[in-house]
């Protein structure tokens, strides 16, 4: 068995005093040597963490003992290496960001469909199957005949619905995502918009891959995950994809052979999207990483710090552009 257990978990529940849970939860995770990130908001908890089997079991038991956090939905997978670098508990407005006020999966949500019943549902010609994940996730794997909304963030999903779906025309809609949480909100949103028969895959793609045999599966490709594994195959093992340290998108070995691929600096997906400022920053970051390697030093810590700082600056620049665009 692999050394590390990866646990994706979430629960929508009213947590009016969620801020008070941050430090006790962080302390518990650190004491159990668990890494990863958990998000807390007034609407619940969400995140993915990794550690030893005993550590994950203890964390789940600790959460189960907290008011409102019993019976958390979780999925387990395994990895030979620790897929996270740090331990974080963040306070958020939403545990999964759709950006629409008043959407509450605790009040109204679509019909849950077990993995064993999913194939029958999506094989119905009257069912419109929609992948609610981001475009770069869809690109490396999805269900057969699924519609790709081509969204770059989950915030764009409501606009996709408004522009492309009609309750009178689309009588039956089935949706899926990685672990199930995005579909909690997407189905709740569709119900609020007047759609009647709305379904979603219980436990998400990860639960489907766990329970459905490959020879019976309608899943094609690999499943993107938000950690250092990048993707997992049908056996929930680390997949064939790597990640561009500039844009964070999944890349193949073929991508690495491209003239546009420069380790740590660019890839075919982002070569035309990087500003000169970003490119210079990535070049310097990679130089520092290689310098540490040449000295025989452990470069992981400094590399991670550089990556995190680069991500932070990218977010700032992106928000500034969005503000300027109106």
From Swiss-Prot:
The keyword Amino-acid biosynthesis does not apply. NCBIfam families: PRK00142.1-4. InterPro entries: Rhodanese-like_dom, Rhodanese-like_dom_sf, TrhO, TRHO_N. The active site is at residue 177. It catalyses: uridine(34) in tRNA + AH2 + O2 = 5-hydroxyuridine(34) in tRNA + A + H2O. One of its GO terms (biological process) is tRNA modification. It holds the Pfam family UPF0176_N. Residues 293-326 are annotated as: Disordered. This is tRNA uridine(34) hydroxylase. HAMAP family: TrhO. The keyword Disulfide bond does not apply. The gene is trhO. Residues 123-217 form the Rhodanese domain. Its EC number is 1.14.-.-.
């Amino acid at each position: 068995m692999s050394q590390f257990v990866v646990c994706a978990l979430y629960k929508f529940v009213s947590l009016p005093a969620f801020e008070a849970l941050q430090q006790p939860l962080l302390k518990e995770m650190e004491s159990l040597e668990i890494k990863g990130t958990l998000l807390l908001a007034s609407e619940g908890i969400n995140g993915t963490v990794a550690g030893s089997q005993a550590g994950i079991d203890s964390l789940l038991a600790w959460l189960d003992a907290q008011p409102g956090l019993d019976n958390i939905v979780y999925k387990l997978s395994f990895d030979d290496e620790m897929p996270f670098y740090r331990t974080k508990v963040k306070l958020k407005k939403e545990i999964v960001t759709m950006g629409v006020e008043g959407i509450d999966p605790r009040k109204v949500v679509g019909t849950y469909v077990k993995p064993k019943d999913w194939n029958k549902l999506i094989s119905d010609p009257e069912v419109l199957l929609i992948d609610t994940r981001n475009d770069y996730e869809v690109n490396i794997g999805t269900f057969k005949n699924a519609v790709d909304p081509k969204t770059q963030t989950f915030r764009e999903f409501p606009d996709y619905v408004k522009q492309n779906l009609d309750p009178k025309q689309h009588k039956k809609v089935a949706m899926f995502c990685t672990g199930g949480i995005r579909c909690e909100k997407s189905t709740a949103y569709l119900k609020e918009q007047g759609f009647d028969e709305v379904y979603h895959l219980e436990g998400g793609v990860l639960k489907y891959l766990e329970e459905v045999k490959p020879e019976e599966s309608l899943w094609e490709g690999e499943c993107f995950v938000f950690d250092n594994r990048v993707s997992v195959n049908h056996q929930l093992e680390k997949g064939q994809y790597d990640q561009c340290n500039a844009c964070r998108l999944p890349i193949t070995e073929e991508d690495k052979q491209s003239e546009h691929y420069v380790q740590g600096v660019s890839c075919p997906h982002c070569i035309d999207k990087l500003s000169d400022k970003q490119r210079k920053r990535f070049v310097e970051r990679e130089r520092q990483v290689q310098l540490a390697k040449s000295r025989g030093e452990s470069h992981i810590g400094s590399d991670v710090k550089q990556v995190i700082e680069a991500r932070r600056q990218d977010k700032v620049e992106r928000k500034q552009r969005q503000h300027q665009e109106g």
